[in-house]
UniProtKB/Swiss-Prot annotation:
InterPro entries: Ribosomal_bL34, Ribosomal_bL34_CS
Name the UniProt record assigns to this protein: Large ribosomal subunit protein bL34
Taxonomic classification: Bacteria, Bacillati, Bacillota, Clostridia, Eubacteriales
Keyword set includes ATP-binding: no
Domain of life: Bacteria
Cellular component, GO annotation: ribonucleoprotein complex; ribosome
UniProtKB keywords: Ribonucleoprotein, Ribosomal protein
PANTHER family xrefs: LARGE RIBOSOMAL SUBUNIT PROTEIN BL34M, MITOCHONDRIAL RIBOSOMAL PROTEIN 34 FAMILY MEMBER
């Protein structure tokens, strides 16, 4: 049986990347919260 998680860098960036976060209002809220929390890495 094949495992369910088959990581792909391109999809990872496209779905969870910085540009994707910036493209929606809620995504910008995510970045804002992560900045306030002091995350070293904001996105994938």
């Amino acid at each position: 049986m094949k495992r369910t998680y088959q990581p792909k860098n391109r999809r990872h960036k496209r779905v969870h990347g910085f540009l994707k976060r910036m493209s929606t209002k809620t995504g910008r809220n995510v970045l804002k919260r992560r900045r306030l929390k002091g995350r070293k890495r904001l996105t994938a």
